[in-house]
Amino acid sequence: MSQLTEFISCIPVVNEEQNEEDERGLCKIQIEDGAMLETLDENSLSGLRIEKMLVSEGTGIFSKSSFGINDLRIFTGENIDEESKKYVWYELLKMLTGHKVYIASLDEKVVFTKWTCRMQDDEVWKVVMELESSAIIRKIAELTLHPVKKGEIDLFEMADKLYKDICCVNDSYRNIKESDSSNRNRVEQLARERELLDKLLETRDERTRAMMVTLLNEKKKKIRELHEILRQNNIKLSDDDVLDSALINTEVQKPISELNSPGKRMKRRKTVVEPQNLQKKLKDTSRRRANRKISNQSVIKMEDDDFDDFQFFGLSKRPIITAKDKLSEKYDDITSFGDDTQSISFESDSSSDVQKHLVSLEDNGIQISAGRSDEDYGDISGSESETDASAGEKKSSNHSEQSGNDREPCLQTESETDIET
Protein backbone atom coordinates (compact mmCIF):
# COMPACT_ATOMS: atom_id res chain seq x y z
CA MET A 1 0.00 0.00 0.00
CA SER A 2 1.39 3.36 -1.00
CA GLN A 3 2.11 5.96 1.63
CA LEU A 4 -0.21 8.95 1.98
CA THR A 5 1.15 12.46 2.42
CA GLU A 6 -0.84 14.88 4.57
CA PHE A 7 -1.03 18.64 4.21
CA ILE A 8 -2.66 21.07 6.67
CA SER A 9 -3.94 24.46 5.55
CA CYS A 10 -6.29 27.21 6.72
CA ILE A 11 -9.32 28.42 4.79
CA PRO A 12 -11.87 31.16 5.49
CA VAL A 13 -15.35 29.83 6.40
CA VAL A 14 -18.40 31.99 5.54
CA ASN A 15 -21.95 31.37 6.78
CA GLU A 16 -24.34 32.68 4.16
CA GLU A 17 -27.36 32.62 6.51
CA GLN A 18 -25.72 34.71 9.21
CA ASN A 19 -24.00 37.98 8.61
CA GLU A 20 -21.12 37.28 10.90
CA GLU A 21 -17.45 37.81 10.46
CA ASP A 22 -15.56 35.19 8.58
CA GLU A 23 -14.28 32.32 10.65
CA ARG A 24 -11.16 30.29 10.12
CA GLY A 25 -11.32 26.58 9.45
CA LEU A 26 -8.69 23.92 9.23
CA CYS A 27 -8.37 21.78 6.12
CA LYS A 28 -6.51 18.50 5.85
CA ILE A 29 -5.92 16.59 2.63
CA GLN A 30 -4.22 13.30 1.86
CA ILE A 31 -2.43 12.73 -1.45
CA GLU A 32 -1.14 9.38 -2.57
CA ASP A 33 2.57 9.21 -3.36
CA GLY A 34 3.48 12.72 -2.31
CA ALA A 35 7.04 12.30 -3.73
CA MET A 36 5.70 12.95 -7.23
CA LEU A 37 4.88 16.52 -6.21
CA GLU A 38 8.58 17.38 -6.59
CA THR A 39 8.51 16.41 -10.28
CA LEU A 40 4.95 17.50 -11.06
CA ASP A 41 4.54 19.26 -14.42
CA GLU A 42 1.77 20.56 -16.63
CA ASN A 43 1.13 17.21 -18.30
CA SER A 44 0.89 15.14 -15.11
CA LEU A 45 -1.16 17.69 -13.18
CA SER A 46 -4.50 16.53 -14.59
CA GLY A 47 -3.87 12.97 -13.39
CA LEU A 48 -3.25 13.96 -9.77
CA ARG A 49 -6.06 12.98 -7.38
CA ILE A 50 -6.79 13.82 -3.73
CA GLU A 51 -7.65 10.75 -1.67
CA LYS A 52 -9.46 12.56 1.17
CA MET A 53 -10.26 16.13 2.20
CA LEU A 54 -11.57 17.27 5.64
CA VAL A 55 -12.73 20.79 6.57
CA SER A 56 -13.88 21.88 10.04
CA GLU A 57 -14.42 25.19 11.80
CA GLY A 58 -14.80 23.50 15.22
CA THR A 59 -18.47 22.45 15.16
CA GLY A 60 -19.07 20.52 11.94
CA ILE A 61 -17.00 18.27 9.74
CA PHE A 62 -17.32 18.11 5.98
CA SER A 63 -15.33 15.91 3.65
CA LYS A 64 -14.87 14.67 0.12
CA SER A 65 -13.10 11.46 -0.92
CA SER A 66 -11.14 10.51 -4.05
CA PHE A 67 -11.74 13.42 -6.39
CA GLY A 68 -9.84 15.02 -9.24
CA ILE A 69 -9.97 17.74 -11.84
CA ASN A 70 -13.25 16.52 -13.34
CA ASP A 71 -15.08 17.05 -10.01
CA LEU A 72 -14.61 20.82 -10.26
CA ARG A 73 -17.50 22.94 -11.49
CA ILE A 74 -16.45 25.86 -13.69
CA PHE A 75 -18.63 28.96 -14.18
CA THR A 76 -17.93 30.13 -17.69
CA GLY A 77 -17.81 33.81 -18.32
CA GLU A 78 -15.34 36.52 -19.16
CA ASN A 79 -11.88 34.97 -19.68
CA ILE A 80 -13.14 31.68 -18.20
CA ASP A 81 -13.95 28.58 -20.25
CA GLU A 82 -13.63 24.84 -19.98
CA GLU A 83 -9.97 25.02 -20.92
CA SER A 84 -9.41 27.12 -17.80
CA LYS A 85 -10.26 24.13 -15.59
CA LYS A 86 -6.59 23.08 -15.53
CA TYR A 87 -5.55 26.47 -14.19
CA VAL A 88 -8.28 26.39 -11.52
CA TRP A 89 -7.25 22.87 -10.46
CA TYR A 90 -3.65 24.02 -10.12
CA GLU A 91 -4.62 27.00 -7.92
CA LEU A 92 -6.72 24.71 -5.67
CA LEU A 93 -3.84 22.24 -5.21
CA LYS A 94 -1.45 25.11 -4.57
CA MET A 95 -3.70 26.46 -1.79
CA LEU A 96 -4.40 23.08 -0.14
CA THR A 97 -0.72 21.98 -0.11
CA GLY A 98 0.60 25.27 1.27
CA HIS A 99 2.27 26.11 -2.07
CA LYS A 100 4.05 22.77 -2.12
CA VAL A 101 2.75 22.32 -5.65
CA TYR A 102 4.27 24.90 -7.95
CA ILE A 103 4.41 25.00 -11.76
CA ALA A 104 5.74 28.22 -13.24
CA SER A 105 3.95 27.82 -16.58
CA LEU A 106 0.54 27.62 -14.85
CA ASP A 107 1.06 30.19 -12.13
CA GLU A 108 -1.27 33.22 -12.11
CA LYS A 109 -3.13 32.20 -15.26
CA VAL A 110 -6.49 32.79 -13.53
CA VAL A 111 -7.40 36.11 -11.95
CA PHE A 112 -9.21 35.61 -8.62
CA THR A 113 -9.33 37.07 -5.15
CA LYS A 114 -9.43 34.16 -2.71
CA TRP A 115 -10.68 30.67 -1.85
CA THR A 116 -13.48 30.42 0.71
CA CYS A 117 -15.63 27.69 2.24
CA ARG A 118 -19.30 28.73 2.20
CA MET A 119 -21.77 27.08 4.56
CA GLN A 120 -25.18 27.12 2.90
CA ASP A 121 -26.84 24.78 5.39
CA ASP A 122 -25.97 21.78 7.45
CA GLU A 123 -26.14 19.58 4.40
CA VAL A 124 -23.76 21.18 1.91
CA TRP A 125 -20.52 23.12 2.13
CA LYS A 126 -18.76 24.43 -0.94
CA VAL A 127 -15.17 25.42 -1.48
CA VAL A 128 -15.43 28.39 -3.88
CA MET A 129 -12.93 30.37 -5.98
CA GLU A 130 -14.14 33.97 -5.89
CA LEU A 131 -13.38 37.16 -7.72
CA GLU A 132 -14.39 40.26 -5.78
CA SER A 133 -14.75 43.57 -7.58
CA SER A 134 -16.63 46.70 -6.33
CA ALA A 135 -18.52 44.78 -3.64
CA ILE A 136 -19.60 42.28 -6.26
CA ILE A 137 -18.49 38.71 -5.71
CA ARG A 138 -18.29 36.46 -8.70
CA LYS A 139 -17.88 32.70 -8.55
CA ILE A 140 -15.29 31.18 -10.86
CA ALA A 141 -15.33 27.56 -9.65
CA GLU A 142 -16.63 25.48 -6.76
CA LEU A 143 -16.14 22.07 -5.15
CA THR A 144 -18.96 20.48 -3.14
CA LEU A 145 -18.31 18.88 0.31
CA HIS A 146 -20.59 16.57 2.23
CA PRO A 147 -21.06 16.38 5.99
CA VAL A 148 -19.59 13.63 8.13
CA LYS A 149 -22.39 12.09 10.23
CA LYS A 150 -20.25 9.87 12.41
CA GLY A 151 -16.70 10.65 13.23
CA GLU A 152 -14.51 13.24 14.85
CA ILE A 153 -11.43 15.23 14.06
CA ASP A 154 -8.64 16.34 16.37
CA LEU A 155 -8.08 20.01 15.69
CA PHE A 156 -5.16 20.14 18.12
CA GLU A 157 -3.40 17.40 16.19
CA MET A 158 -3.97 19.34 13.00
CA ALA A 159 -2.64 22.48 14.67
CA ASP A 160 0.42 20.57 15.90
CA LYS A 161 1.02 19.26 12.37
CA LEU A 162 0.70 22.77 11.04
CA TYR A 163 3.14 24.00 13.69
CA LYS A 164 5.70 21.34 12.79
CA ASP A 165 5.39 22.20 9.13
CA ILE A 166 6.01 25.84 9.98
CA CYS A 167 9.08 24.83 12.00
CA CYS A 168 10.43 22.83 9.08
CA VAL A 169 9.83 25.76 6.79
CA ASN A 170 11.66 28.09 9.15
CA ASP A 171 14.58 25.68 9.46
CA SER A 172 14.79 25.41 5.71
CA TYR A 173 14.59 29.15 5.40
CA ARG A 174 17.39 29.61 7.95
CA ASN A 175 19.59 27.06 6.17
CA ILE A 176 18.98 28.76 2.87
CA LYS A 177 19.75 32.12 4.43
CA GLU A 178 23.01 30.82 5.93
CA SER A 179 23.97 29.29 2.61
CA ASP A 180 23.17 32.54 0.87
CA SER A 181 25.26 34.48 3.41
CA SER A 182 28.16 32.07 2.96
CA ASN A 183 27.93 32.38 -0.80
CA ARG A 184 27.87 36.17 -0.57
CA ASN A 185 30.94 36.16 1.68
CA ARG A 186 32.70 33.85 -0.74
CA VAL A 187 31.81 36.14 -3.63
CA GLU A 188 33.14 39.15 -1.73
CA GLN A 189 36.35 37.28 -0.90
CA LEU A 190 36.80 36.31 -4.54
CA ALA A 191 36.14 39.92 -5.54
CA ARG A 192 38.87 41.13 -3.15
CA GLU A 193 41.28 38.50 -4.46
CA ARG A 194 40.47 39.60 -7.99
CA GLU A 195 41.24 43.19 -7.08
CA LEU A 196 44.61 42.12 -5.65
CA LEU A 197 45.36 40.11 -8.77
CA ASP A 198 44.40 43.05 -10.94
CA LYS A 199 46.75 45.28 -8.98
CA LEU A 200 49.54 42.73 -9.32
CA LEU A 201 48.91 42.52 -13.05
CA GLU A 202 48.93 46.30 -13.35
CA THR A 203 52.22 46.47 -11.42
CA ARG A 204 53.71 43.76 -13.61
CA ASP A 205 52.53 45.49 -16.76
CA GLU A 206 53.99 48.79 -15.61
CA ARG A 207 57.35 47.17 -14.85
CA THR A 208 57.32 45.33 -18.16
CA ARG A 209 56.43 48.52 -19.99
CA ALA A 210 59.19 50.43 -18.23
CA MET A 211 61.71 47.70 -19.03
CA MET A 212 60.67 47.63 -22.69
CA VAL A 213 60.90 51.42 -22.91
CA THR A 214 64.38 51.28 -21.38
CA LEU A 215 65.48 48.59 -23.85
CA LEU A 216 64.06 50.53 -26.78
CA ASN A 217 65.80 53.70 -25.66
CA GLU A 218 69.08 51.81 -25.33
CA LYS A 219 68.53 50.36 -28.80
CA LYS A 220 67.90 53.80 -30.27
CA LYS A 221 70.95 55.17 -28.48
CA LYS A 222 73.09 52.35 -29.86
CA ILE A 223 71.71 52.96 -33.35
CA ARG A 224 72.60 56.65 -33.09
CA GLU A 225 76.12 55.75 -31.98
CA LEU A 226 76.50 53.36 -34.91
CA HIS A 227 75.23 56.02 -37.32
CA GLU A 228 77.71 58.49 -35.88
CA ILE A 229 80.56 55.98 -36.34
CA LEU A 230 79.49 55.41 -39.96
CA ARG A 231 79.30 59.15 -40.56
CA GLN A 232 82.76 59.71 -39.10
CA ASN A 233 84.18 56.99 -41.36
CA ASN A 234 82.43 58.52 -44.41
CA ILE A 235 80.38 55.38 -44.95
CA LYS A 236 77.14 56.11 -46.75
CA LEU A 237 74.05 54.38 -45.48
CA SER A 238 71.91 52.43 -47.89
CA ASP A 239 68.77 54.12 -49.17
CA ASP A 240 66.88 50.83 -48.98
CA ASP A 241 66.55 50.87 -45.19
CA VAL A 242 63.06 49.84 -44.08
CA LEU A 243 61.49 50.91 -40.82
CA ASP A 244 60.93 48.26 -38.19
CA SER A 245 57.24 49.13 -38.04
CA ALA A 246 56.90 48.46 -41.76
CA LEU A 247 58.55 45.06 -41.41
CA ILE A 248 56.41 44.15 -38.41
CA ASN A 249 53.15 45.20 -40.06
CA THR A 250 53.87 43.57 -43.42
CA GLU A 251 52.21 40.27 -42.59
CA VAL A 252 49.43 42.00 -40.66
CA GLN A 253 48.32 44.09 -43.62
CA LYS A 254 48.33 41.15 -46.01
CA PRO A 255 45.19 39.03 -46.39
CA ILE A 256 45.26 35.54 -44.96
CA SER A 257 46.79 33.11 -47.44
CA GLU A 258 48.76 29.90 -47.45
CA LEU A 259 51.97 31.91 -47.01
CA ASN A 260 51.11 33.73 -43.80
CA SER A 261 48.42 31.50 -42.33
CA PRO A 262 49.67 30.19 -38.97
CA GLY A 263 48.29 26.71 -39.60
CA LYS A 264 49.82 26.46 -43.07
CA ARG A 265 53.18 27.77 -41.83
CA MET A 266 53.26 25.23 -39.02
CA LYS A 267 52.41 22.43 -41.44
CA ARG A 268 55.12 23.53 -43.87
CA ARG A 269 57.64 23.80 -41.03
CA LYS A 270 56.89 20.24 -39.97
CA THR A 271 57.38 18.94 -43.51
CA VAL A 272 60.77 20.69 -43.68
CA VAL A 273 61.99 19.70 -40.24
CA GLU A 274 61.03 16.04 -40.40
CA PRO A 275 63.35 15.11 -43.35
CA GLN A 276 66.21 16.95 -41.63
CA ASN A 277 65.62 15.02 -38.46
CA LEU A 278 65.48 11.79 -40.47
CA GLN A 279 68.78 12.55 -42.18
CA LYS A 280 70.34 13.43 -38.84
CA LYS A 281 69.16 10.14 -37.35
CA LEU A 282 70.56 8.22 -40.34
CA LYS A 283 73.92 9.96 -39.95
CA ASP A 284 74.01 9.19 -36.23
CA THR A 285 73.17 5.55 -36.95
CA SER A 286 75.91 5.22 -39.57
CA ARG A 287 78.42 6.90 -37.25
CA ARG A 288 77.58 4.53 -34.41
CA ARG A 289 77.92 1.56 -36.75
CA ALA A 290 81.34 2.78 -37.92
CA ASN A 291 82.55 3.23 -34.34
CA ARG A 292 81.27 -0.22 -33.42
CA LYS A 293 83.05 -1.69 -36.47
CA ILE A 294 86.38 -0.06 -35.49
CA SER A 295 86.13 -1.20 -31.86
CA ASN A 296 85.40 -4.79 -32.87
CA GLN A 297 88.01 -4.95 -35.63
CA SER A 298 90.74 -6.43 -33.38
CA VAL A 299 88.40 -8.96 -31.80
CA ILE A 300 86.26 -10.18 -34.67
CA LYS A 301 87.87 -11.48 -37.83
CA MET A 302 86.69 -9.64 -40.89
CA GLU A 303 84.65 -11.81 -43.21
CA ASP A 304 84.55 -11.58 -46.97
CA ASP A 305 82.05 -9.12 -48.32
CA ASP A 306 79.28 -11.22 -49.83
CA PHE A 307 77.50 -8.13 -51.03
CA ASP A 308 80.38 -6.60 -52.94
CA ASP A 309 78.33 -6.42 -56.12
CA PHE A 310 75.13 -5.42 -54.33
CA GLN A 311 73.36 -2.64 -56.22
CA PHE A 312 71.67 0.09 -54.16
CA PHE A 313 69.17 2.38 -55.87
CA GLY A 314 70.54 1.46 -59.30
CA LEU A 315 74.21 2.11 -58.35
CA SER A 316 77.10 -0.27 -57.53
CA LYS A 317 80.41 0.13 -55.76
CA ARG A 318 82.48 -0.81 -58.84
CA PRO A 319 81.83 -1.00 -62.60
CA ILE A 320 79.75 -3.97 -63.65
CA ILE A 321 81.72 -6.47 -65.84
CA THR A 322 79.59 -8.26 -68.37
CA ALA A 323 80.01 -11.93 -69.33
CA LYS A 324 81.67 -10.98 -72.64
CA ASP A 325 84.32 -8.86 -70.87
CA LYS A 326 85.04 -11.71 -68.42
CA LEU A 327 85.59 -14.18 -71.31
CA SER A 328 88.01 -11.78 -73.06
CA GLU A 329 89.99 -11.26 -69.85
CA LYS A 330 90.25 -15.04 -69.29
CA TYR A 331 91.48 -15.54 -72.90
CA ASP A 332 94.19 -12.86 -72.53
CA ASP A 333 95.40 -14.41 -69.26
CA ILE A 334 95.61 -17.91 -70.81
CA THR A 335 97.53 -16.62 -73.89
CA SER A 336 100.06 -14.65 -71.85
CA PHE A 337 100.57 -17.58 -69.52
CA GLY A 338 101.22 -19.97 -72.51
CA ASP A 339 103.83 -17.63 -74.08
CA ASP A 340 105.73 -17.33 -70.82
CA THR A 341 105.73 -21.12 -70.40
CA GLN A 342 107.06 -21.70 -73.93
CA SER A 343 109.91 -19.19 -73.52
CA ILE A 344 110.92 -20.62 -70.18
CA SER A 345 110.97 -24.20 -71.52
CA PHE A 346 112.97 -23.20 -74.62
CA GLU A 347 115.58 -21.36 -72.59
CA SER A 348 115.95 -24.33 -70.25
CA ASP A 349 116.47 -26.70 -73.24
CA SER A 350 119.09 -24.47 -74.86
CA SER A 351 121.01 -24.01 -71.62
CA SER A 352 121.06 -27.78 -71.05
CA ASP A 353 122.49 -28.39 -74.58
CA VAL A 354 125.29 -25.87 -73.98
CA GLN A 355 126.21 -27.50 -70.71
CA LYS A 356 126.42 -30.94 -72.40
CA HIS A 357 128.69 -29.56 -75.14
CA LEU A 358 131.01 -27.92 -72.60
CA VAL A 359 131.31 -31.18 -70.69
CA SER A 360 132.30 -33.04 -73.85
CA LEU A 361 135.01 -30.45 -74.63
CA GLU A 362 136.49 -30.78 -71.17
CA ASP A 363 136.67 -34.53 -71.60
CA ASN A 364 138.70 -34.02 -74.81
CA GLY A 365 141.08 -31.57 -73.10
CA ILE A 366 139.93 -28.50 -75.04
CA GLN A 367 139.48 -25.24 -73.15
CA ILE A 368 137.19 -22.58 -74.65
CA SER A 369 136.20 -19.29 -73.08
CA ALA A 370 132.69 -18.31 -72.43
CA GLY A 371 132.65 -15.78 -75.27
CA ARG A 372 134.08 -18.30 -77.74
CA SER A 373 131.63 -20.95 -76.87
CA ASP A 374 128.86 -18.45 -77.35
CA GLU A 375 130.15 -17.64 -80.87
CA ASP A 376 130.59 -21.33 -81.91
CA TYR A 377 127.23 -22.33 -80.72
CA GLY A 378 125.44 -19.08 -81.36
CA ASP A 379 123.76 -20.39 -84.50
CA ILE A 380 122.00 -23.21 -82.72
CA SER A 381 118.81 -21.31 -82.63
CA GLY A 382 119.08 -17.99 -84.51
CA SER A 383 117.76 -15.16 -82.41
CA GLU A 384 117.84 -17.24 -79.22
CA SER A 385 121.71 -17.75 -79.45
CA GLU A 386 122.18 -14.05 -80.11
CA THR A 387 120.11 -13.32 -77.09
CA ASP A 388 122.28 -15.66 -74.99
CA ALA A 389 125.51 -14.10 -76.36
CA SER A 390 124.33 -10.62 -75.52
CA ALA A 391 123.35 -11.89 -72.09
CA GLY A 392 126.88 -13.35 -71.65
CA GLU A 393 128.50 -10.07 -72.66
CA LYS A 394 126.25 -8.19 -70.29
CA LYS A 395 127.15 -10.58 -67.50
CA SER A 396 130.92 -10.17 -68.11
CA SER A 397 130.62 -6.38 -68.24
CA ASN A 398 128.52 -6.37 -65.11
CA HIS A 399 131.14 -8.49 -63.38
CA SER A 400 133.96 -6.11 -64.31
CA GLU A 401 132.03 -2.92 -63.47
CA GLN A 402 130.11 -4.10 -60.37
CA SER A 403 132.46 -6.57 -58.71
CA GLY A 404 131.86 -4.98 -55.29
CA ASN A 405 128.16 -4.19 -55.69
CA ASP A 406 125.90 -6.14 -53.34
CA ARG A 407 122.58 -5.03 -54.85
CA GLU A 408 122.64 -7.76 -57.60
CA PRO A 409 124.04 -10.95 -56.06
CA CYS A 410 122.26 -13.22 -58.48
CA LEU A 411 123.92 -11.65 -61.57
CA GLN A 412 127.34 -11.68 -59.94
CA THR A 413 127.03 -15.36 -59.11
CA GLU A 414 126.11 -16.22 -62.69
CA SER A 415 129.04 -14.22 -64.14
CA GLU A 416 131.57 -15.85 -61.82
CA THR A 417 130.23 -19.21 -62.81
CA ASP A 418 130.74 -18.38 -66.48
CA ILE A 419 134.32 -17.15 -65.94
CA GLU A 420 135.36 -20.31 -64.06
CA THR A 421 133.93 -22.46 -66.79
Curated annotation (Swiss-Prot):
One annotated GO molecular function: chromatin binding
Q: Where is this region: Disordered?
A: 365-421
Enumerate the residue ranges of region (Interaction with NEJ1): 1-196
Q: Where in the cell?
A: Cytoplasm; Nucleus
Q: Does the keyword Membrane apply?
A: no
Of the GO CC terms on this record, one is: DNA ligase IV complex
Basic and acidic residues bias spans? 391-409
Give an example GO biological process. Answer: double-strand break repair via nonhomologous end joining
Recite the UniProt keywords alphabetically: Cytoplasm, DNA damage, DNA repair, Nucleus
Domain of life here? Eukaryota
**Cited function:** Involved in non-homologous repair of DNA double-strand breaks. Stabilizes DNL4.
| Quaternary structure and partners | Interacts with DNL4 (via BRCT domain). Interacts (via N-terminus) with NEJ1 (via C-terminus); the interaction is direct. The DNL4-LIF1 complex interacts with POL4.
Q: What else is known?
A: Present with 876 molecules/cell in log phase SD medium.
UniProt lists the family membership as follows:
Belongs to the XRCC4-XLF family. XLF subfamily.
Q: What's the protein here called?
A: Non-homologous end-joining factor LIF1
